[in-house]
């Protein structure tokens, strides 16, 4: 079966013994936003929304790290959207780890599995607290199913590989079963690899590992963890590229990426936006303009501005990334 390629390769290439020997292992949100009130000390008191649809609020019990907490809701949708701004990147990753671990606990208890999608780039570094105590010992890693929102069509031991990045910094440090790590078949062409990955996802839907969104018919991942480029791209969906408008396919190939390597595969926006929870993690002043454009939705809105979620979208920003808001 076509789907077996994805599963077999996820097993073969998730184990370090099967990697090649040369792979080295060891004024925005008008009218309906909420913003924190600054305390007189060096700490900040943030507000969060407990039920955005009703407008009710509560004080957050954690006033240690957040500089601001903003919230809004999409008109006509139940989706919740939060923007969390942190004084230091280190504090951001602490809260991101708790956010991820809490969702893992929720879905493992509710459905016996936790489907997680990651991007490449700086996002993987932001997951570093998950491989430390207490999470490395408390998370039910055996129930995780691990995917990539996009991948470069290169060997898995190549420096451009999102698989290698995730393996070196994350997968090699946690006991996710190798068969639950879904890597692409990089021996195929970009187009064939995209088709193979989509077939793999459909098989997981048929076996009830992946849910399907009742509203869109696309796969519904439990958590999508995304980074954003300085140009506002997410996954391998770049500003002005036609793939941003793809509305039918789950996974597509790209052969003309403006960033090398040129050949990649990527989830489409309907798949990304059908996720239950999405975290968009952005750090650094070099991305501040794209953050501003994505959240204010003015001018040429970058792809990141098109990201949504069925249950909750959370932007995790450090102060430099939020400096133009």
Curated annotation (Swiss-Prot):
A motif (Microbody targeting signal) lies at residues 323-325. Keywords: Chloroplast, Hydrolase, Peroxisome, Plastid, Transit peptide. One of its GO terms (cellular component) is peroxisome. It comes from Arabidopsis thaliana (Mouse-ear cress). Pfam families: Glucosamine_iso. Expressed in roots, leaves and shoots. This is 6-phosphogluconolactonase 3, chloroplastic. Belongs to the glucosamine/galactosamine-6-phosphate isomerase family. 6-phosphogluconolactonase subfamily.
């Amino acid at each position: 079966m076509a789907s077996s390629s994805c599963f077999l390769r996820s097993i073969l290439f998730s184990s370090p013994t099967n990697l090649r020997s040369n792979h080295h292992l060891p004024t925005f949100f008008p009218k309906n936003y909420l913003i924190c009130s600054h305390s007189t000390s060096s700490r900040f008191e943030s507000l969060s929304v407990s039920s955005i649809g009703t407008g009710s609020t509560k004080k957050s019990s954690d006033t240690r790290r957040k500089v601001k907490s903003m919230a809004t809701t999409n008109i006509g949708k139940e989706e919740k959207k939060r923007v969390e701004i942190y004084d230091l990147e280190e504090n951001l990753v602490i809260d991101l780890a708790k956010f991820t671990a809490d969702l893992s606990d929720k879905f493992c208890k509710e459905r016996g599995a936790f489907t997680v999608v990651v991007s490449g780039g700086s996002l993987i570094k932001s997951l570093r607290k998950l491989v430390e105590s207490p999470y490395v010992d408390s998370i039910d890693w055996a129930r995780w199913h691990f995917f990539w929102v996009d991948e470069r069509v290169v060997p898995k031991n190549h420096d451009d590989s999102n698989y290698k990045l995730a393996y070196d910094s994350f997968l090699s440090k946690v006991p996710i079963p190798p068969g639950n790590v879904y890597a692409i078949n990089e021996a195929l062409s970009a187009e064939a690899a995209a088709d193979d990955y989509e077939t793999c996802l459909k098989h997981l839907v048929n076996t009830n590992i992946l849910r399907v969104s009742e509203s869109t018919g696309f796969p519904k991942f439990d958590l999508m963890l995304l980074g954003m480029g300085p140009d506002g791209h997410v996954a391998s969906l770049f500003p002005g590229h036609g793939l941003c408008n793809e509305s039918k396919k789950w996974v597509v190939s790209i052969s003309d990426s403006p960033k090398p390597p040129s050949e990649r595969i990527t989830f489409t926006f309907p798949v990304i936006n059908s996720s239950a929870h999405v975290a968009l993690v952005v750090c650094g002043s070099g991305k501040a303009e794209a953050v501003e454009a994505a959240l204010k939705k003015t001018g040429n809105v970058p792809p990141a501005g098109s990201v949504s979620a069925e249950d909750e979208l959370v932007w995790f920003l450090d102060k430099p990334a939020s400096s133009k808001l």
